[in-house]
């Protein structure tokens, strides 16, 4: 394996640990995850499909909270509105997650640069 394929490296790293499913009847709200389409964040995209693969391991993950990660910002427009692109992106993905049969994105913790003022 070379460092030319960071997505494969990540998959191999994840596969090193398999968690036992303890008490699968207990509903879990995962309070922290990210999604992104580009490779700039980590060297590979992390999509709803990847998210469902990770959360579909047998644990009873009934919902999740997306935390901002500077993904899918608007490329143009006023700088104070560029983070809204991430919220729009995740809102669309959350709608898809609601009908997918997998873990559902229940909340979004978004970003706004308050140092820009009102």
Name the predicted role of every residue range:
Residues 1-118:
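Helix-coil boundary/capping segments in enzymes
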């Amino acid at each position: 394996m070379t460092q030319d394929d960071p997505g494969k490296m990540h998959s191999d790293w994840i596969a090193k640990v398999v968690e036992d499913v303890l008490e699968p009847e207990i509903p879990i709200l995962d309070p922290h995850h990210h999604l992104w389409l580009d490779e700039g964040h980590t060297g590979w995209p992390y999509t709803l499909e990847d998210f469902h693969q990770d959360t579909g391991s047998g644990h009873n993950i009934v919902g999740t909270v997306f935390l901002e990660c500077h993904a899918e910002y608007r490329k143009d427009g006023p700088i104070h509105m560029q983070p809204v692109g991430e919220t729009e992106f995740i809102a669309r993905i959350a709608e898809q997650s609601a009908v997918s049969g997998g873990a559902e994105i229940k909340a979004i913790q978004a970003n706004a640069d308050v140092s820009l003022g009102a």
